[in-house]
Amino acid sequence: MSNQHIEELNDQQIVRREKMTALAEQGIDPFGKRFDRTANSAELKEKYADKTKEELHELNETAIVAGRLMTKRGKGKVGFAHLQDREGQIQLYVRKDSVGEDNYEIFKKADLGDFIGVEGEVMRTDMGELSIKATKLTHLSKSLRPLPEKFHGLTDIETIYRKRHLDLISNRESFDRFVTRSKMISEIRRYLDGLDFLEVETPVLHNEAGGAAARPFVTHHNAQNIDMVLRIATELHLKRLIVGGMERVYEIGRIFRNEGMDATHNPEFTSIEVYQAYADYLDIMNLTEGIIQHAAKAVRGDGPIDYQGTEIRINEPFKRVHMVDAIKEVTGADFWPEMTVEEAIALAKEKQVPLEKHFISVGHIINAFFEEFVEETLVQPTFVFGHPVEVSPLAKKNPEDTRFTDRFELFIMTKEYANAFTELNDPIDQLSRFEAQAQAKELGDDEATGIDYDFVEALEYGMPPTGGLGIGIDRLCMLLTNTTTIRDVLLFPTMKP
């Protein structure tokens, strides 16, 4: 440690380092060693929930707990403290005549934030709080910095996102939200595993961005001296596995898109993609509904859920509507009759729909109508299906009306939560779609993809009829934890240095 660093320490930090040195001089390792616990705070509270003070005294049961010291009070020969572990907090009752002089000195000199182990009798105070009456204290690790202000938790938003460790220590609500996230993902896995899906892993580094319309991050592989991109989707590799005969696969993993950031978008995020051979988009609709309802029930219980004051009937069958019907219902514009691009553009101008240079077909304009007018009306869970071919380069055409695809998106609270379709397995059609995307890219569409000839070749070996699905894990977690910003469900959101 340099002198310059020591000079920058504040008074509290200096005192804590002095205590660290004092512990070492007493033969106590300031940063401890392994420690065996018999219970955590939640287990004790559950086990003894219905026991009175007198009953606990009669039982005379002991427990060994460990955690971070969050509060400490008292003077003389008696003290109280709260110890925090992963499940919550439990009160400590420490008497000098119970732990001995040396042990009590450890307690007196302990700072908030220190980790200690405690062995003692399970009791209830006169105020009715379940506590541990300590008989032995063990110093486990020294905290060299003071914790955030103890009564109000960490409230500075910038610090919450940059120093998530402090947020987790200080804010139980935040801690529980991330526990819920983990449980949600585990339940999704459990649901799919129960349906005989196989979890797989595919590359993060790709030679060509594909599987979605998004701008990629570009990096360089030094050993091979080639530019590569971080994946914007797992789709094309997973479909290669369907070609290979795996039939039912899914991957939960990180996706990277070099795009804007807002309340629902982070450049690095988690998605799940699922592919099922011999299925179509209607089968995948049912699968999607099952996944989301199973996850919601696991973390929020039966019945509807509240999201920011709106009751979401997530437990009921999801509404299903064709995109063209949804547009007609909201705007009156009818795209069912065949029309020219010029007629569609005129209709868009009449309704003041913003037009981009790469809108070169009726399909692009239909999609623009939907995004401009319909999305904001979709509050309850709604499957919107029948997207135009032009905005669905990997989806199979609807056999009854080839202007549209057998694709759907799930909307809840006006946001997209899932995207799925009957997969395109015709390699000739796939190449044609890729070429159309390449043309759009040349016209300025930064999100259009290039041509993945290797994937087209894989399709030429034959892929069975397949349904595929993608769900944004972070956005689903926001819904199920009643959170308004994606940063609150990402442990370490992207931040400027």
Curated annotation (Swiss-Prot):
Subcellular location: Cytoplasm
NCBIfam families per record: lysS_bact (TIGR00499), PRK00484.1 (NF001756)
Residues that hold Mg(2+) 2 according to the record: E416
Self-association and partners: Homodimer.
A Pfam short name: tRNA-synt_2
Lineage: Bacteria, Bacillati, Bacillota, Bacilli, Lactobacillales
Keyword line: Aminoacyl-tRNA synthetase, ATP-binding, Cytoplasm, Ligase, Magnesium, Metal-binding, Nucleotide-binding, Protein biosynthesis
Coiled coil (UniProt feature): none
Gene Ontology biological process terms, A to Z: lysyl-tRNA aminoacylation
Gene3D superfamilies: Bira Bifunctional Protein, Domain 2, Nucleic acid-binding proteins
Any GO MF annotation of the entry: magnesium ion binding
Protein name: Lysine--tRNA ligase
Enzyme Commission code(s) on record: 6.1.1.6
Main subcellular localisation: cytoplasm
Amino-acid positions noted as binding Mg(2+) 1 in the UniProt annotation, renumbered to this chain: E409, E416
Gene Ontology annotations for the cellular component aspect, listed alphabetically: cytosol
Annotated cofactor note: Binds 3 Mg(2+) ions per subunit.
Catalytic reaction annotation: tRNA(Lys) + L-lysine + ATP = L-lysyl-tRNA(Lys) + AMP + diphosphate
Enzyme class: ligase
Cofactor: Mg(2+)
Organism domain of life: Bacteria
